[in-house]
Amino acid sequence: MKINLLVLTISAVLSITACSNKDQKQTSQQKTESLETENNIQKSDKKMAKPIHLTKAEFLQKVANYEANPDKWVYLGDKPCIIDFYADWCGPCKMVAPILEELAQEYDGQIYIYKVDTEAEMELASDFGIRSIPTLLFCPMGEAPQMAQGALPKDAFKQAINEVLLKKS
């Protein structure tokens, strides 16, 4: 009887231990996979430059404080930029959005690409006289900005970036 009880106890302890070790192995493997996934996401986020959405307050800090300088354009950025005045419902704006994302990656470190939602930032859009969308404002360093309206093809954007913003012929 004592031998049966001893065998039963040992087998119970072994089965519990075996099951709990299996769970720990799975948990550590899941943690490792989770960390690898997080690291891959963080690495890909660092590589993926994207357009930056601006509010009016951010515009006044990063681009130009036209309230403090109403008579003169003073660009505040350290790199040239493109500002896309858009709306979520606008078909041509939806056509331009992926082009701007590609250009943000292609010209990462050389220019900024900003986006201003005209529905959310009506005052800012009004201050710049935005009547049709998409409207794009090209802001070179040390010069007056240039405005373009409508959905431009990627080569037109690249030409404007190279000639107006980066001064490449």
Residue map of PLM features:
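Structural signal for short hydrophobic segments within the conserved structured cores
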Residues: 52, 112-114, 145-148
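Thiol-based oxidoreductase modules, predominantly thioredoxin-like and allied folds used
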Residues: 85, 96-104, 108-123, 130
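A short beta-strand-turn-helix
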Residues: 55-80
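C-type cytochrome heme c attachment motif
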Residues: 88-95, 135
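Non-catalytic, surface beta->alpha helical segment in thiol-disulfide oxidoreductase systems
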Residues: 132, 137-169
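Extracytoplasmic/secreted proteins, especially bacterial periplasmic and envelope-associated proteins
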Residues: 54, 58, 81-84, 95, ...
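Short pre-active-site segment immediately N-terminal to redox-active cysteine/selenocysteine motifs
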Residues: 78-81, 85-89, 132
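N-terminal targeting signals for export/organelle localization
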Residues: 1-60, 169
